[in-house]
Every structure is written in C-alpha cells, then in structure tokens.
Amino acid sequence: MAKVDIHPIWYPDAKVYCDGQLIMTIGSTKPELHVDIWSGNHPFFTGSQRIIDTEGRVERFMRKYKMEKD
C-alpha cells in the first residue's frame, strides 16, 4: 500500500531573489528562494573572471619544502 501525504508541496511559481531583486520564477518545493550568486552576477558568466594566482603552485611547493630549482 502506498503511503499518503509523503510528497512535499510543489510551488510552480516560486520566486528567486538575489539582493532583494526578483530574478526569475521557477518550480520548487519552497515558495521563495534567496540566493547570493546566480548566472547574471557570477564572474564566470559575466566575462569579468580574473585568475588571481599571486604565487605559482610549483614555487609555493619549492619554498614550502625549502627546495631549489634545478
């Protein structure tokens, strides 16, 4: 026998907010979703991605284990 009332309530028009601004409407099990990052403000998707590597991994390893490059 199948259990009754085990599924969550589905909200077909759940609102997604980022910084208090309505971003989109989706289907969800919660009526409102508040996000910090979404594709509209993420650096990877907006093209403002910067790679910050002040110290290379090899140099860091060499310095950490006090080794010299050959």
From Swiss-Prot:
Q: Where does this protein have coiled-coil stretches?
A: none
- Recorded superkingdom: Eukaryota
State the compartments where it is located. Answer: Plastid, Chloroplast
| Disulfide cross-links | none
Q: Does the keyword Chloroplast apply?
A: yes
MF terms from GO for this chain are:
rRNA binding; structural constituent of ribosome
Keyword Zinc carried by entry: no
Q: Which Gene3D superfamilies match?
A: Ribosomal protein L31
The cellular component terms of Gene Ontology attached to this UniProt record, alphabetical and capped at eight, are: chloroplast; ribonucleoprotein complex; ribosome
- Give the record's GO biological process terms: translation
A Pfam family found in this protein is Ribosomal_L31
Keyword annotations: Chloroplast, Plastid, Ribonucleoprotein, Ribosomal protein, RNA-binding, rRNA-binding
How does the annotation summarize its subunit structure? Answer: Part of the 50S ribosomal subunit.
Query: What role does this protein play?
Result: Binds the 23S rRNA.
In the record, the note on similarity to other proteins reads: Belongs to the bacterial ribosomal protein bL31 family. Type A subfamily.
State the name under which the record lists this protein. Large ribosomal subunit protein bL31c
- Taxonomic placement: Eukaryota, Rhodophyta, Bangiophyceae, Bangiales, Bangiaceae
